[in-house]
Regions:
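Contiguous, well-folded functional domains in the mature portion of proteins
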Residues: 2-171
Length: 171
């Protein structure tokens, strides 16, 4: 059962399907890939919500990192939850404590339940508005059901463009 199922009381998805190939998640926003523990938020940095990485964000658009379904777009628009067609749950959380901005600086380009292809724009981000509100602009990429999946490896490092492979899964 993944994080969103636990949070919203949904039922667990049937077994995650892997076709024997290494699964890959693409970087959803331009920036510098950093280890999860370097994020300026203890909840993300300690991997309580799942394994992943951080991104010192430089881009202003969040793209779908894989083919899948948008599972969550909070009213505050600061994050997007997704489920890949292969069963990978990913939380893309832009900025730290940006829920406090109540949507200012964010424009949603999608909605919950939307089926999207990798590279589909999901969210526009105003990094200056985040900074002006006194929040770090780092983005957390969290595989919220990482305990239910094969071993995850962060394969991107340093400056990277959206669309660069960032996570791979091994059997």
């Amino acid at each position: 059962m993944g994080f969103f199922d636990k949070l919203f009381g949904g039922k667990a998805a049937s077994e995650t399907k892997f076709s024997g190939q290494k699964m890959t998640v693409m970087l959803p926003i331009d920036g510098k890939v950093i280890p999860l523990e370097q994020l300026p938020d203890e909840t993300f940095a300690s991997a309580i919500m799942g394994h992943g990485c951080g991104v010192e964000t430089t881009g202003d658009t969040v793209y779908a990192p894989f083919d899948g379904t948008v599972t969550q777009v909070p009213e505050s628009l600061h994050a997007v939850g997704m489920m890949s067609d292969d069963g990978i749950e990913l939380l893309i959380h832009v900025g730290m404590d940006t829920v406090e901005m109540k949507g200012q600086g964010f424009t949603s380009l999608t909605k919950e339940g939307a089926k999207v292809k990798a590279g589909t724009p999901l969210l526009k981000v105003d990094l200056e508005a985040i900074r002006a509100a006194g929040h770090p602009t780092a983005t957390a990429l969290i595989v919220t059901n990482s305990d239910d999946l094969p071993e995850i490896s962060v394969v991107a490092n340093g400056d990277a463009a959206a669309g660069t492979p960032v996570f791979k899964f091994k059997k």
